[in-house]
Regions:
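Contiguous segments within soluble domain cores/interaction surfaces
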Residues: 1-129
Length: 129
C-alpha cells in the first residue's frame, strides 16, 4: 500500500499539482522512499491539462526523468527535461518563470513538506522531501 501526498502551486496562467506516492516502509516520508512524482500543468481558465510529467525512482541512481505527455498527439515523447520543454496544447513551448514562482511558494506555503532538491522535470530546484 502506498501513501499519497499532494500539494498545489498556482500562477496566473497555470496550476501545478505535485503528487508523491510513498511505499509504506515505516520510514519517514522523504524522497528516498517515494515511488514516483507526477506533475500536471493545467490551464486555470479552461482547466485543460497542458502537460503531464512523471518521474520514477531508480534505486541505483535516484530520480530519472521518464516522459512528457503531449496532449496534441495523445502520446508520450522523450524530451530533454528543462522547464522550456513543457509545451502547451498548441505545441508551443511554455516558460512562465517557474523557478521564481516555485521558490516563492516554497518560502511562504506551509503545505510544503521538507526542503528543496533538484527536480529535473522543471530543470530547477524542486522536490518535496
Amino acid at each position: 500500500m502506498a501513501t499519497a501526498v499532494e500539494t498545489h502551486l498556482r500562477t496566473s496562467d497555470f496550476y501545478f499539482k505535485i503528487r508523491l506516492l510513498y511505499k509504506d516502509t515505516g520510514l519517514a516520508i522523504n524522497t528516498a522512499n517515494a515511488d514516483d512524482i507526477t506533475v500536471e500543468i493545467i490551464n486555470q481558465e479552461s482547466q485543460e491539462i497542458i502537460a503531464i510529467k512523471t518521474l520514477s525512482q531508480d534505486s541505483a541512481s535516484g530520480y530519472e526523468s521518464i516522459i512528457l505527455l503531449d496532449p496534441t498527439t495523445d502520446g508520450y515523447i522523450d524530451v530533454p527535461m528543462n522547464k522550456e520543454d513543457f509545451i502547451d496544447s498548441a505545441g508551443t513551448l511554455v516558460d512562465k518563470g517557474m523557478y521564481e514562482y516555485i521558490a516563492t511558494v516554497y518560502e511562504t506555503d506551509s503545505n510544503f513538506i521538507g526542503g528543496l532538491a533538484d527536480f529535473q522535470g522543471f530543470g530547477e530546484a524542486f522536490i518535496l522531501a
